[in-house]
Amino acid sequence: MQSTSLSRPIPVFSNRINVNSPSLSTIISYPHFTEREYSNRLKEIYSLGIDFIFSVGRTKIGSMEIAGKGCVSLVVKAEIKNTICALKIRRTDASRKTMDREVNLHRIANSAGVGPGILDYSENFVITEYIDGLSIINWINNQNINPEQVRNVINSTMEQCYKLDKAHLDHGELCRLDHHVIVSQSDATNIIDFESSSTKRKTCNVTAAAQSLFLSGLVSKRVNEILHLPEREKIIKALRIYKQDQSRNNFDNIMSISVR
């Protein structure tokens, strides 16, 4: 696992909502609320020991702020016995009937040393370690970061991608790196959200992340401003070689060319 402070005791906040509160009903049973579904899910929440959910995050549903929203689940900040965690809530309209598949894929990532650790799960919920930090795009737009910090974050992110390639787990969404990499206050990087992952596709974690970091999009634009990347053709050639043979030597070649 990545070296960052993930689970810790917390003080009392005004946005800390007891799980019994009716204000959480539309989040717990999002997007189609029924009394029966809500009641069943509340029992699951009790069994998992979840005490509070926080209204905090960059996404809003009604008056509730949450950490994220995807096609399969919502993510909220939660508390279990005075410890912060992340809680994934399966959407009532999700194509998947349980969270089992995602848990299995997430565990493969964890076995490779990637991603926040899974703490517990049930049919409709997954509890993981909480990553306290900024999305990589918000982090890199900070005017106070220096080239060495950027190199370290890129190296860490790409190393994790290489580990996923070697574990034969394709994340599936690393071409949209800004939504799936969080950088902590200590500049530790964490790849999150494995709901689109697969062991059946050819892995392209390194090449997808490199595209976002070095070649196209807002993150790469800022990286280039700070590090003055080499010619695109050199990076593209190295990525093509790696795509044919995902060896350590070919990975190191990408990094030596890109992050000088």
Model-identified regions with their sequence ranges:
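Catalytic phosphate/metal-binding cores of nucleic-acid and nucleotide-processing enzymes, i.e., regions
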Residues: 90-92, 158, 162, 176
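ATP-binding glycine-rich loop module of kinase domains
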Residues: 39, 47-100, 107
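C-lobe/activation-segment region of protein kinase-like
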Residues: 173, 184-260
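A conserved alpha-helical element in kinase catalytic cores
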Residues: 89-122, 152, 213
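Juxta-kinase regulatory segment immediately upstream of eukaryotic protein kinase catalytic domains
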Residues: 2-64, 254-259
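Hydrophobic residue at the +6 position relative to the catalytic HRD Asp in the kinase catalytic loop
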Residues: 178-183
